Structure formats: C-alpha cells, structure tokens
Amino acid sequence: MINFDFFTPTKILFGAGRESEVGKQVVAFGGHKVMIVYGKKGGHIETSGLLDRVHKSLSDAGLSYVDLNGVVPNPRLSLVKEGIRIGRAEGVDFLLPIGGGSVIDTAKGIGYGIANDFEMEDLLYGRVKTDKNLSIGVVLTIAAAGSEMSSSMVLTIEDGMMKRSYGHDCARPKFAIMNPELTYSLPAYQTASGAADIMMHTMERYFTPTDTDTSLTDRIAEGLMVSVRDAAQVAVKEPENYEARATLMWAGSLSHNGLTGAGRISDFATHKIEHELGGMFDVAHGAGLAAVWGSWARYVYKTNPGRFAQFGKKVFGINISSSTNITPNSDAPEQPIKPSPIITDPELTSTDTAALAAITAWETWCHSISMPTTLTELGIHPTDTQIEEMAEKCVFGRNGHVGFFQPLTKEDIAAILKMAK
C-alpha cells in the first residue's frame, strides 16, 4: 500500500423511521437556522409527506428553517448561487439536503459560497482553494452517488455547460440519515442507474496504477461489488425489498467514502468523460457511466490485463482454463455471461481473453438491470464534432489529460467516445 489518509467523520443513522431524529441531530451539531435543499417543488419529497416530517422534527427541536427547491440532475451552479444569496440573507448556519447526490452536492456548493468570499467558478476551475464550509446533514432518498459521506461535489457551470468538481474534507456531512424505505418509490431505471454509479465508484478505485500489495483493499472492493451486483438485480424487480434496498444504500456510502481505494491511486477517467456527456446531453449519471466504461476498458486493458482478469474472476465468477474456455461459476449473475467474439483472436493471451470476458461480464450485468453499454443504447447520438468538443472540455484545466490507470489525452477520449457509439 502507498501512504493514505482515511477520514470518515459522518455519523450514520441507518434504518426505518430514522428521519424523525433529524432535528435532534442538527441541534447536536450546533445548527440554529437550517436551509432545507431538495428537488422539484410539488415532487415526491413533498407529496410523500417526508418534507412535512422533517419540518416537524426541526420545529420540535426549536429550530427555524427555510426551504430551497428546484435541484435537477447534473445540478446547476445558478441554483447554488441563489442558495448562497438566500442563505446569507437568512443567516443560515446549517444545510440539510433531502435527496441524492445532486441535492447534496448543491448543498455543499451553497455551504462553500456562504462560508467564503470568492466566485464559485474560481473554486470549480481550481483557481482558488478553501477548507471552509457550513455544517451539513443529509436525509438520503437515493442510493447512488455516495455524496452523503464523501468530500466531493460536482456542479454544472451553465456557461459552456461544464461539469466540474471540488473536494475537501470540510464538506463531508456531519450526519446522514439513511432509511432504505425512502428509496422504495424510485423507478427501476433510477434504481439501476444508482447501482451502476455505486459500482463505478469502486471500479474507478479498483483499476489502479499502484503496483504495491493492496490485496486487503481489493477484497473489500470485490465484496462490495458482488453485493451490489446481486442487490441491484433484486431491487429493480422487487422495489420494496428492504434488504436489497438497504444493501444498495449502505454500499453507496461505502463505495465513495474512500474505503475501497485505501492505499492506492484512483483513476476516475470514466467519470470525467461521463461528466462531459452529462453536461452536453443531460443524461443520468450512472447510465452514462455504464454506457462509456466498456469502451474505456477495451481501450486501456492492455495496460494491465491481469487486473481486468481478476475483476472478472472475483466479481463475476469468470473462470478461464488453459484452453481459454470461459465458464461462469455458480456465483455469477442471473443472466449467463457471453464472451465477446474478440476472445477468439489467436494472438490474445489467456490473460487478455479473461480480461475481455470480464468487460463483457460487466456489460451483461448492466443489461440485466436495463442499463446501457453504448451511447446509442443511452439514447444519444453525438456527432464527431460534438465528440471532439467533449474531449477538449474534458482535459481543460487538467494538464492535458485525465485518469491514472492509463492517462488519457483528448485524442484518447475522442477515440473512446467513438468506440462507445
């Protein structure tokens, strides 16, 4: 392992009905005036009665609050700025997002803006840094992004539709209330997209250039991915299966709090590429990741085919014999894994064959939960000009490349996006 810091200050309150405790938690962490941040006005947060329950809990704890709604997927900087303006005027000292990653990231952005005196664009483009944010608590309703325990946020700058991130431990929420029952109403597509995002947060850490022994972190990561693999297939068919929903919710947090990347360098190239898809086409984040990853993997797997082979064996049960026959074992996903035709290439080594079979196994799993594995399946058809624009934006301000497993230039990114069509 390489040297690492692991910091997880977020208090987790997990289980049915825990949202009733939100007021006490805000008080315990020093809050007085709360800004509640959530999605669509008149949406499920309101119609389900959840917002009313949160209001009551805050009032019972003697807290005042102001609501800010209107968060959308691929959250916009303009709403963050509106929240900063309102928060300063109202004397807000505590932020309470109710929702998933987009809502939480919006709250993190508002916290940075209230606590500091700079333009948010400067923070997102890396021109300034800060270690100051307001205190944040979360009522989680979507298992996906893991922002409830992470240090990072991703926001869309409407000028140029650029998605950019910033991360610091000061933005890690003080607490997160996680009731799996609050995810029962999610559509199957959103559930599956969330599961793909959870998987990808660990996969981005699993495919690493670090060549020291990280076997302990590997086993943690592989166990999490197997659990998500299975729970997702249950949850899309049985939306009120508590155990499947609980597994996804907890896995979402563990997948993005640093645990599955401890002691090694993470990649995150696929995330950076998908951010450009989200910025240009406003696609669901997890679905966009699923649509791109297979092409990224086939483009870079020769860098370390053994890593992909291990992924296939440990996560999808791919066994490969000396004769290069691929057979899923009993621990494989529900749908049979069909090797890619490319594995018949006589110039491929057995490790190459296993690596390519692993990539196909991931795509088979994606299809089993109705996730796309190409841009066409995602429902978008970027032109070559649009692809070149996305590739250019992807490396903008990043020293001309993204990723660490195999650093990618804008030419590499364009090639991957063309492969993904």
Language-model features and meaning:
Residues S20, A115-L216, Q310:
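A glycine/threonine-rich phosphate-anchoring loop and its flanking beta-alpha core
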Residues M199-M203, R245-H256, W293, W362, ...:
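Short alpha-helical scaffolding segments that buttress acidic/His motifs in well-ordered protein cores
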